[in-house]
């Protein structure tokens, strides 16, 4: 069973382009913040990393969009860790609409740097 982290989010003005569609950079920022919160909840937060001179860094992100959400739309971000591969830490995420339909499916690869 995978450990899930979920956050509900209503897209605001800073999250969307002039066309009122989700900006990819806003999605990445939200995924990064949710991943950090989840890592902290799992015991790999600041006291185990940054306070010891270690830094989490995102190396790669991939995402597939079924539909791009729009301004003022309520969405749910779900993220979970994958199996560690040596010094690489994969993490997966999906963005769901208000009906639970998948809007985005993605993955990110994290490194723990000294």
Question: What are these language model-derived features?
Answer:
Residues 2-3, 62-114:
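HotDog/MaoC-like acyl-thioester-processing domains
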Residues 1-58, 113-114:
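Hot-dog-fold acyl-thioester-processing enzymes
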């Amino acid at each position: 069973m995978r450990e899930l982290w979920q956050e509900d989010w209503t897209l605001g003005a800073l999250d969307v382009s002039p066309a009122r569609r989700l900006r990819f950079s806003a999605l990445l920022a939200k995924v990064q913040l949710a991943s950090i919160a989840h890592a902290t909840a799992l015991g790999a937060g600041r006291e185990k990393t940054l306070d010891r001179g270690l830094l989490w860094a995102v190396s790669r992100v991939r995402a597939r969009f079924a539909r791009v959400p729009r301004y003022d739309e309520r969405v749910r971000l779900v993220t979970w860790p994958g199996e560690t591969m040596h010094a690489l830490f994969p993490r997966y995420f999906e963005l769901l609409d208000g009906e639970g339909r998948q809007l985005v499916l993605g993955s990110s690869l994290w490194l723990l740097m000294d």
